[in-house]
Amino acid sequence: MKKTSAIILAGGKNTRIARNKAFIQLPTGETILQNTLNVLQRIFPQIILVTNQKEFYLKFNVQVVEDLIKGCGPLGGVFTGLCYSVSKHNFVVACDMPCINPALIRLLLKERGTYDVVIPEVDGEVEPLFALYSKNCIPVMFECLQGRNLKMSEVIGKLQVKKIGAKEIDRFDPQHLSFFNINTEEDLKSLQIKMDQAK
């Protein structure tokens, strides 16, 4: 069994932005998805992309899978990725997060120990779509999916969790850009400003 894998969630319905967020072009000229792959491929031997639009992603050099349990949002995607993964520990990220920091990902991996979940927490809020999940999560997630309890925060509350606080995060990502996601056209404009400030 490989030590770690990555899972990209690309199953959102894009209700607030009129295009597939994974293929939005960044100021660098790359799409969000290509930027994400460039980061993850340097760290993980296996990358799984979970989507409900499989045909759009077959050209990429990743394992593309569809939700095992349909219509369950991010929880269904994480569950599916864990089921397909060959690794005990798996880094999960959404496809609309354009600034993921490889050093921060490595910090989560370093802290994995025997925990079910290693997750950043800033101002009392956790980041479930930039976190590390163990295959040990599968039974709890399945139970929650069966009961239609789909809130990631509630699922995480049932598991053994290591939280990474702002002080540790700030060493690698002081602006917390890793957690910035694109939901609207305004977010794209805001991203350019944030990237300029980070230079």
Each predicted region: which residue ranges?
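Nucleotide and nucleotide-moiety/phosphate-recognizing core
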Residues: 2-136, 142-149, 157-176, 192-198
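An accessory alpha-helical subdomain
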Residues: 151-152, 180
